[in-house]
Each structure stands twice: as C-alpha cells, then as structure tokens.
C-alpha cells in the first residue's frame, strides 16, 4: 500500500483518493434529501467589498448550482439570466429557477449538457443580472479546479435517506460496544 493510499484510508483503485467535503444533513428541500459541496467565495469585480458564494448541490440524481451575492437588497427575479464566460470565449446563459427574492439567490438545475459544459471548460467570469445592478464575478484557476472537483464528487455521490445513515451508524456503534459483564 502506498503512502497516499494510507493517508487517504482508501485501498479501492476505483475510488477517488481525496475528501470531497460533501455534506448531507437531516433537512429536506422540497421533501427530498439533498447533499451540498463547500461554498466557493468569488470576488465581485465591479462592486467594492462585495463577494458571492458559489455552491453545488444534489437532490436525487439532479445537480444544482447556487450563487448568492453578499450585498444589500440584491433582488433577482425568477427567469432572470446569468452568463458564464469561458476562457475559450464561449458564453452560456442560464435562467434563474429560484423564485423572486431580494437576498441575492440564483439557483439553476443543471442539465447533463449544462453540467458537462461547466465541468469541461474553464470559467473566466460569471455575470449576474439583478434587478437594480449587474454583478461580475471573477473565477480564478484554483476556483476552476475546485468547481471541477466538486462536480466530479457530486456526480459520484449517492444522496442517502437520512434514516439509512442513522441505521448504519447505529449498527456500527453496536458492533463497537464492549460486551457487558464481569
């Protein structure tokens, strides 16, 4: 066993040898269990001291992209668009699936084609068209790597029913309990 395998604690050749950081809680979204990746902080280029968070999530077999702009009164309407600019010069436009909100939330369920486009191409910037102002988000090379890694992780991740997780954990605890007696 190599040092890398020992550190990762994984001897299966077909598994990824890195921690994806995927979190699944007991909460449900639209009555379905979901999992999410760690948020990636993106700098807003055209507004000082403003950041946005990019996060991916999964419900059933569907992958979602969420962006929240951390600024006051950022109203984004349902079906308002977001443009992703790739380093190749190509631009992809997504419509907001989330209801009208003034908390700066943009959500998009990624189709297989959308997923592949975002995963296989380096993003240079993202532009969100809010009600009163447009926000331009810069995406670095390191953030592109994180995006690719998180999409790979989510694609392979199976969302569990939280009850199944509890049962497995409970069975594991029972095995580890010492036998009672003197």
Regions found by a protein language model. Give the residues of each.
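Bacterial Sec-dependent N-terminal signal peptides
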Residues: 1-8, 180-182
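An ectodomain-focused feature that recognizes extracytoplasmic/extracellular
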Residues: 5-72
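Residue-level detector of beta-strand face positions
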Residues: 41, 81-83, 125-127
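Generic structural motif
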Residues: 47, 57-59, 70-74, 87-89, ...
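Residues at beta-strand starts and edge strands
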Residues: 48, 59-63, 78-80, 104, ...
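Mid-length scaffold segments of soluble, non-membrane domains
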Residues: 62-95
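Internal interaction segment
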Residues: 88-182
């Amino acid at each position: 066993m190599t040092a890398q395998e020992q550190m990762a604690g994984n001897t299966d050749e077909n598994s990824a040898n890195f921690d994806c950081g995927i979190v699944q809680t007991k909460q449900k979204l639209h009555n379905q269990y979901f999992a999410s990746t760690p948020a990636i902080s993106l700098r807003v280029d055209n507004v000082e001291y403003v950041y946005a968070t990019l996060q991916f999530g999964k419900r059933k077999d569907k992958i979602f992209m969420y962006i929240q702009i951390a600024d006051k009164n950022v109203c984004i309407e349902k079906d308002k668009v977001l443009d992703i600019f790739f380093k190749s010069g190509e631009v992809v436009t997504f419509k907001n699936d989330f209801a009208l909100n003034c908390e700066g939330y943009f959500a998009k369920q990624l189709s297989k084609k959308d997923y592949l486009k975002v995963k296989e191409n380096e993003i240079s910037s993202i532009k969100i068209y809010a009600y009163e102002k447009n926000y331009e988000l810069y995406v670095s090379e390191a953030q592109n790597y994180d995006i690719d890694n998180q999409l790979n992780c989510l694609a392979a991740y199976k969302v569990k029913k939280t009850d199944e997780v509890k049962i497995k954990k409970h069975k594991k605890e029972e095995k580890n309990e010492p036998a009672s007696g003197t």
